[in-house]
Design a protein with these regions (language model features):
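Beta-strand-rich domain onsets/edges
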Residues: 75-101
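A short beta-turn/strand-edge loop motif at beta-sheet boundaries
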Residues: 109-115
Length: 125
C-alpha cells in the first residue's frame, strides 16, 4: 500500500470483519480509479487485476489514513460495541461493491438496548 501511495497511486486496504462462510476476517488492496475501485491481491509476486477471492461478503470497510467524519463519541466506552467499530479510521464502503441498499428490522422495544449491530452468521454459527 505505502509503495503504491509513494508514487501517487490512490490505494487503500478494504476488509471484512467476518466472512459468512469462513468465521474470520479478510483484507485486500484496492486502487481507486475514475470508474470506481479495482480490488487486487498479490499472488506469486504479481498483482492480479479483477481479483475475486470468491468469499461471500457482508459489510465491507476501508482502513483510512485520517479520522472519518462520523460521530462515534457515544460508543467509545461501551463494551457491548465491537472494538473494530469504535475506530475513527474506518468507513463503510459496502456501497462501492454492491450498490446502495437498505434493510428494515423490527425490534421489540422491551428487549432492546441502545445499540443494534447487523452482522453475518456462518456455519456452525
Amino acid at each position: 500500500v505505502y509503495v503504491l501511495r509513494s508514487v501517487g497511486i490512490p490505494v487503500a486496504t478494504d476488509f471484512i470483519i467476518s466472512a459468512p462462510e469462513a468465521q474470520g476476517s479478510h483484507s485486500w488492496t484496492v486502487i481507486k480509479d475514475g470508474d470506481g475501485i479495482i480490488p487486487f491481491e498479490y499472488e506469486d509476486g504479481k498483482v492480479t487485476q479483477g481479483y475475486d477471492d470468491k468469499r461471500l461478503k457482508g459489510k465491507i470497510y476501508r482502513q483510512c489514513f485520517g479520522k472519518q467524519k462520523k460521530d462515534i463519541t457515544g460508543i467509545m466506552d461501551k463494551p457491548e460495541v465491537p472494538a473494530v467499530l469504535k475506530s475513527p479510521y474506518i468507513k463503510d464502503v459496502t456501497g462501492e461493491y454492491f450498490g446502495e441498499n437498505s434493510v428494515e428490522v423490527e425490534i421489540d422495544e422491551t428487549e432492546c438496548g441502545q445499540y443494534a449491530y447487523l452482522g453475518v452468521f456462518s456455519f456452525p454459527g
